Amino acid sequence: MRLSVVIVSYQVKDLLHQCLCSVERAIDGINADILVVDNASTDGTVDMMKQWHPSVKLIASQENLGFGKANNLAVSQSDSEHILFLNPDTVLPEDNLTEALAVMDADTDIGSMGCRMIDGTGEFLPESKRGMPTPMIALYRLIGLSKLWPKHASY
């Protein structure tokens, strides 16, 4: 398998459905699978998955494992070359994964990749741009400098 898309879900049935529809379109033509760990949702997520997304590998936990442990569980069941961790409120453009994989293939020094996030109106989400976490950057954020100069290259 070339790519596994890992999604952790808890009480977000409708958002997850939209996310999965976009991921299924984005992986068309890619040797990929989708793994969803549901953290014991009671909102009908498991039934929705079985009805609308039967090809998605569903790991229905009987307890809320938490975000990190649920991601680790999915990764332990993947044998893919690449792993994409995706939040269930994400909608992917159709060509997004093809382009990302091409970049990864072109440069074997790349070990991980982030993305530029935009909201539903097309506006850039600054939380998708993070500087390297250093003590100095933590201090800038703590005392408010990052709010005074939000476009500074340090953060």
Regions found by a protein language model. Name each.
Residues 132-155:
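Short, flexible, basic/aromatic active-site loop/helix in glycosyltransferases
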Residues 91-127:
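Conserved donor NDP-sugar-binding/catalytic core segment of glycosyltransferases
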Residues 83:
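Short aromatic/hydrophobic "clamp" motif used to bind/position activated sugar donors
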Residues 17, 43-51:
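Acidic helix N-cap motif at the loop->helix transition within catalytic regions
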Residues 1-25:
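N-proximal low-complexity "stem/linker" segments adjacent to membrane-targeting elements
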Residues 60-78:
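Glycine-rich, basic loop-to-helix element that forms the pyrophosphate-binding segment
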Residues 22, 38-46, 63:
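A conserved acidic beta->alpha catalytic loop
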Residues 31-40, 59-61:
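Short beta-strand/loop segment that forms part of the nucleotide-sugar
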